[in-house]
């Protein structure tokens, strides 16, 4: 499947804009503020069901109270999203295959791989950012993981609520410890398996983007030690006094982290911005492979301002890496030397 056309009205800074898209590489270029990222957001909204930038009211053009997004693709099923902020209550509606709903039905959701400049903070940002990265991709790949994660998070809220009471007993916490250990074990083991799969190919993907002459090795490590439900249960019980004094659960998968190394040292300390960008893009490449293997379909690839800090060689290799998939790239300038790319100039305003 690939997107063939998009049409937006009163969306972000676009009063109205429409364009056709090619089945392979599309480069939407224009000056900063011309609305390139907004078009990727519209595609994400139509196929994933969510925006990566904000709330519906933020998406409405400053001179309007409504927006409309429509997409056509090779399935011949048109998608239309409308949002109307007029009246007492805002109304949002998806119309797909001539059926209207308040949310995008699961059967019409399509996998999307998105890169934004904010992803560069994955390497040197907070552990919470890296956990969110793991949780987002694993929830997309594995509904069982998503269920276990939600169960863990609900139990964590209840346990932390009890820990805020000075007279809480270990017996009161035990039922929540059991849920945390059972669901937490599944969360940890799935994260570990994902990291193992990433390590099997990330160096190859990195070198593929960086160029054949590059011999740098990349590795990812998940920091958790205990995996079994029994070990986690013992750990929660052993931490009772510390948790009671702190007033929250001090250990578990909600505190874990991943570390990325380049050439044997932590990437956050030594990697250049171009190397960090290449690592993130290698991860996106692996995500695309996993989704294709899991669902038997190639995801849409949306790359926002992807070429910053990448030399021309890495730009060329990046495009070749995602060969035979639809890629929609934004840039401040047309991409030279890629004859097969469909280049779309976006005028400001």
Task: Say what each PLM segment does.
Residues 1-31, 171-182, 186-300, 309, ...:
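Conserved NTPase motor "head" modules and their coupling/switch loops across ABC/AAA+ ATPases, GTPases
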Residues 36:
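Conserved lysine of the Walker
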Residues 121, 132-174:
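Long, charged N-terminal accessory/stalk domains
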Residues 339-349:
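A short helix-turn-beta junction within AAA+ P-loop NTPase domains corresponding to the substrate/partner-engaging
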Residues 45-129, 138-141, 145, 199, ...:
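Nucleotide-state sensing region of NTPase/ATPase domains
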Residues 304-306:
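Walker B catalytic acidic pair
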């Amino acid at each position: 499947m690939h997107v063939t056309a998009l049409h937006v009205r009163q969306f972000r800074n676009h009063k109205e804009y429409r364009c056709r898209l090619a089945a392979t590489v599309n480069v939407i270029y224009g000056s900063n503020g011309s609305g390139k990222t907004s078009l990727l957001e519209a595609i994400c909204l139509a196929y994933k069901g969510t925006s990566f930038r904000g709330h519906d009211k933020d998406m409405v053009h400053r001179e309007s109270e409504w927006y409309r997004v429509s997409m056509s693709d090779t399935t011949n099923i048109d998608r239309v999203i409308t949002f109307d902020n007029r009246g007492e209550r805002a109304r949002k509606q998806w119309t797909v295959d001539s059926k209207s709903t308040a949310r995008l039905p699961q059967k019409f959701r399509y996998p999307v791989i998105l890169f934004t400049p904010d992803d560069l903070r994955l390497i040197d940002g907070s552990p919470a950012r890296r956990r969110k990265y793991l949780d987002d991709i694993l929830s997309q790949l594995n509904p069982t993981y998503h269920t276990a994660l939600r169960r863990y998070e609900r139990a964590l809220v209840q346990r932390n609520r009890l820990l805020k009471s000075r007279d809480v007993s270990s017996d009161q916490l035990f039922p929540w410890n059991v849920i945390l250990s059972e669901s937490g074990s599944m969360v940890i083991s799935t994260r570990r398996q994902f990291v193992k799969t990433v390590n099997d190919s990330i160096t190859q993907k990195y070198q593929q983007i960086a160029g054949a002459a590059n011999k740098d090795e990349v590795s990812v490590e998940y920091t958790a030690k205990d995996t079994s439900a029994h070990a986690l249960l013992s750990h929660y019980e052993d931490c009772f006094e510390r948790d009671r004094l702190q007033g929250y659960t001090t250990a578990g998968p909600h505190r874990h982290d991943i570390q990325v190394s380049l050439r044997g040292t932590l990437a956050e300390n030594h990697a250049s911005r171009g190397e960090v960008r290449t690592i993130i893009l290698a991860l996106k490449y692996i995500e695309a492979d996993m989704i294709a293997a899991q669902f038997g379909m190639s995801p849409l690839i949306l790359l926002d301002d992807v070429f910053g800090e990448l030399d021309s060689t890495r730009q060329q290799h990046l495009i070749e890496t995602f060969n035979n998939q639809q890629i929609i790239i934004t840039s401040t300038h047309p991409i030279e030397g890629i004859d097969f790319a469909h280049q779309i100039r976006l005028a400001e305003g």
